[in-house]
A protein has these predicted regions:
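NTP-dependent nucleotidyl-transfer catalytic core
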Residues: 9, 45-65, 70, 77-388
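Charged, compositionally biased N-terminal leader segments and the immediate start
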Residues: 10-52
Length: 388
């Protein structure tokens, strides 16, 4: 053709239409066959659930159905006789190699080799998208998991929670949900004060000051490691006379929680603003180790939510105020109690102690209130034994 251009039918990127792989839905196909069989027998009004289970033993086929046993009572027939009739209808499927009747009337279905190959092709063509769907349609779900106190290394129980939580979050994301993975940092309570005190006491030991170490403080080698880091960076900057630390505490029995609280109060008084440095150093060291362990484990979080931020923002005070307005609190023995038994709990819970100190339960309520203020459709909490 003069001045023209001959096209021999070459395929280019512009004229290729990519056809997504089509998933063979065997269960839906078999359900349609059985529905038609019921319709032919005038049984459509029964509206039974037709379910297919995966047999535990390969010798029982690829799918098993108990529809015949569901029909036995309304039809007043033996399940095996009904199963035989249904098996005839199923045998017409091009996906089935054979259909067997087993036991009291189970219908066992065996797929053909070509049907299995068809599904294998679908898996290969789907690639990384295999198993994904849009079932969640972008619904916002938050999964909070692990959330171990940052007062020491993670243990096997935390690893179990991490594996379970991360797997669940991945499955939900693959199903089309908008998933937020969140770790709640308990950085505002007494346990963090105990960690700070423990670290400081080990630091004093490195400076030649060796006060008696409380038996109910944190004993792990990781506490000594943190003390060494502080000593290496600051030498004797945070040293104070140990006798001042034990003022008024000596009268309290050693090893009691009251004695430990007295040491914490004295440490805060002696260190002043430096106490915040010891506290935050210990917190950040433990959180850093936690993050690294989880990352090596293949677990990451979009949000690390600080409990302390709820106090700083007034979130805890707001939550307690809302409970008071709703008449969900009452006073007893000088403490404020939440009527949790009204909601199925085994006992009511203290939200504010007689000394005015708010409990973990109060900040947990504030945390849940914060979660639902973010526009989440659903919240999933995965707790370990230390959260009970």
């Amino acid at each position: 053709m003069a001045g023209g251009r001959y096209n021999s039918g070459c395929v280019t990127a512009e004229n290729v239409v990519v056809v997504p792989p089509v998933q063979p839905n065997f269960k839906s196909h078999f359900t349609d066959i059985l529905r038609d069989a019921l319709d032919d027998r005038g049984l459509a009004d029964l509206n039974l659930d037709i379910e297919f289970a995966r047999p535990r033993q390969a010798s029982h086929g690829d799918y098993s159905c108990n529809l015949a046993m569901q029909l036995a009572k309304p039809l007043r027939q033996k399940p095996r006789d009904i199963a035989q009739s249904l098996a005839v209808a199923l045998a017409a499927s091009p996906y089935l190699e054979k259909v067997e009747i087993a036991g009291a009337g189970f219908i066992n279905l065996f797929l053909t080799t070509s049907a299995k190959q068809q599904f294998s092709r679908y898996v290969l063509e789907s690639g990384e998208k295999f198993g994904h769907s849009n079932m969640g349609a972008g619904e916002k779900i938050q999964v909070e998991f692990v959330s171990a106190n940052p007062t020491g290394p993670l243990h096997v129980g935390h690893g179990r929670g991490a594996a379970f939580g991360a797997s669940l979050a991945n499955v939900l994301a693959a199903a089309g949900y908008s998933v937020t993975r969140e770790y709640y940092i308990n950085d505002a309570g007494r346990q963090m004060d105990i960690l700070a005190l423990s670290t400081w006491l080990r630091y004093l030991e490195l400076n030649g000051v060796a006060p008696d170490f409380p038996p109910n403080a944190y004993q792990g080698e990781y506490v000594r490691d943190m003390a060494r880091l502080i000593h290496k960076a600051h030498a004797g900057r945070y040293v104070h006379k140990p006798e001042l630390l034990f003022e008024e505490v000596a009268e309290v029995e050693v090893g009691t929680e009251a004695a430990l609280d007295g040491l914490i109060a004295n440490a805060k008084k002696l260190l002043g603003q430096d106490y915040a440095y010891i506290h935050n150093f210990a917190l950040n060291e433990q959180l850093g180790d936690c993050r690294n362990d989880l990352m090596e484990f293949g677990v990451t979080f979009a949000t690390w939510f600080s409990e302390q931020s709820l106090f700083d923002s007034g979130g805890v005070a707001q939550a307690v105020h809302l409970l008071e307005e709703g008449n969900y609190l009452y006073q007893q023995d000088g403490a404020n109690w939440f009527r949790s038994t009204d909601f199925g709990d085994e006992k009511d819970r203290v939200v504010q102690r007689e000394n005015g100190q708010l409990t973990y339960f109060a900040s947990d309520i504030a945390y849940d209130l914060n979660k639902f203020s973010r526009g989440l459709h659903r919240v999933i909490d995965i707790w370990g034994a230390d959260h009970r």
